[in-house]
Structures are given as structure tokens and as C-alpha cells.
Regions:
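A conserved short coil-to-beta-strand element within the FAD-binding core of flavoproteins
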Residues: 83-95, 120
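Conserved N-terminal Rossmann-fold NAD(P) cofactor-binding segment
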Residues: 67-70, 93-94
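General small-molecule cofactor/ligand-binding pocket signal
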Residues: 10, 80-82, 138
Length: 163
């Protein structure tokens, strides 16, 4: 994604932790998973016109019993959802999205862009601690492998019972 430095762009966790507030009216959320839905609803509560951009052909395409509740919350908040598109680049208060055929669309993003496009495992700390100490280290949840929250919950419970 080019041009992120020219726009008002942040990551979902920074926004949800209250580290970032946006002026402007039109906000974009990049990523249509559960976190993206939560961010979109919060932005809508701030009075913004929110659009979710999802690269997959279906919004909230996850096997989970909570999906209908998230879909309803997004719908009730008046959030627009565009599927089958990805963010191509940002140019100040404009975002260019593109579909799989290369067709581009320009969207206003004066109210900020929140990237909620998933997480990556982070094993560096575990590896460093194992190399430098005698402490037994257990890594769980998305820090180990990105999955659904139910997997992380079970894994955390299992490790807690072991120690």
C-alpha cells in the first residue's frame, strides 16, 4: 500500500486503545473481520460515515456463532461494506481501492483510515528469552499463530493449567 504516510492512517489496536482520534467525516476501515467490524461501529458512533473495504468476496467470512451479531451491529450503525476490493494507495484525504480486475475507485478518507487486516505471529520474544534465560516460556494466542479467539482461549487455559 503506497502513500500511507500522506494520509491519516493508523492500525486497529491503536485506534481501539484510544491512542488516535480523527477529524473529518469519511472514515475507511481496511479489513472486514471481527476487529474491523468493531472499529467501524466505534467510528460510526463518533458520527463518521464509515466504509469497510474487504478483499474477500464476503464480509465477516468466518465460522463463528457471533458473526450475526457483528453483522447486525455494522448494519445498524449505517456502515457501508465494499467487498472484493483492496486498498491500492492513499493520497492525503483520498483512498484508491481496486478490485481483482484492476478497476479502481476513489473514496474520501478525510476522517481517517484504520488498518485492520489481520495479525502476524510474534515469536521473537519467546526465542530471545529461551536463548538468554533458563525460564520456560509459553507463547499462546495470535503471538504463536493467528487463529480465532476460541483457539487462543483454549490454548491459554491449557497453558495456565500446566503452570
Amino acid at each position: 500500500m503506497n502513500g500511507l504516510e500522506t494520509g491519516k492512517v493508523t492500525y486497529a489496536l491503536n485506534y481501539l486503545n484510544g491512542e488516535v482520534k480523527f477529524d473529518g467525516e469519511n472514515a475507511l476501515v481496511i479489513g472486514g473481520g471481527i476487529t474491523g467490524a468493531e472499529v467501524a461501529v466505534e467510528l460510526a458512533k463518533e458520527g463518521k460515515k464509515v466504509t469497510i473495504i474487504e478483499v474477500m468476496d464476503q464480509f465477516l467470512a468466518l465460522p463463528s456463532a457471533v458473526i450475526p451479531a457483528y453483522q447486525m451491529a455494522v448494519e445498524q450503525a449505517g456502515v457501508k461494506v465494499i467487498t472484493g476490493h483492496r486498498l491500492d494507495y492513499v493520497d492525503h484525504d483520498q483512498a484508491i481501492i481496486v478490485d481483482r480486475f484492476g478497476n479502481k475507485k476513489e473514496l474520501k478518507s478525510d476522517g481517517g483510515i484504520v488498518i485492520s487486516a489481520g495479525f502476524m505471529p510474534q515469536l521473537e520474544l519467546q526465542e530471545k528469552l529461551e536463548e538468554e534465560t533458563d525460564i520456560e516460556v509459553y507463547t499462546v494466542g495470535d503471538a504463536k499463530k493467528v487463529r480465532q479467539i476460541i483457539d487462543a482461549t483454549h490454548e491459554g487455559y491449557a497453558v495456565a493449567r500446566m503452570i
